[in-house]
Amino acid sequence: NLLQFNKMIKVETGKNAIPFYAF
């Protein structure tokens, strides 16, 4: 699931969540 993947990236990246969330 892409949404779950993005959510995981947000947690992993922290402050860098914004650029990854853009994808």
Swiss-Prot record:
Record's subcellular location: Secreted
Catalysis: reaction(s): a 1,2-diacyl-sn-glycero-3-phosphocholine + H2O = a 1-acyl-sn-glycero-3-phosphocholine + a fatty acid + H(+)
Textual note on the cofactor: Binds 1 Ca(2+) ion.
Cofactors, names only: Ca(2+)
Any one GO BP annotation for this protein: lipid catabolic process
E.C. numbers: 3.1.1.4
Posttranslational mods: Contains 7 disulfide bonds.
The entry's keywords: Calcium, Disulfide bond, Hydrolase, Lipid degradation, Lipid metabolism, Metal-binding, Myotoxin, Neurotoxin, Presynaptic neurotoxin, Secreted, Toxin
One cellular component term from this protein's GO annotations in UniProt: extracellular region
Tissue expression profile of the protein: Expressed by the venom gland.
EC class (word): hydrolase
Superkingdom, taxonomy of origin: Eukaryota
GO MF, any single term: metal ion binding
Function of the protein: Snake venom phospholipase A2 (PLA2) that shows presynaptic neurotoxicity and low myotoxicity. PLA2 catalyzes the calcium-dependent hydrolysis of the 2-acyl groups in 3-sn-phosphoglycerides.
Further details from the record: Negative results: does not show myotoxic activities.
Family: Belongs to the phospholipase A2 family. Group II subfamily.
Name the UniProt record assigns to this protein: Basic phospholipase A2 intermexin
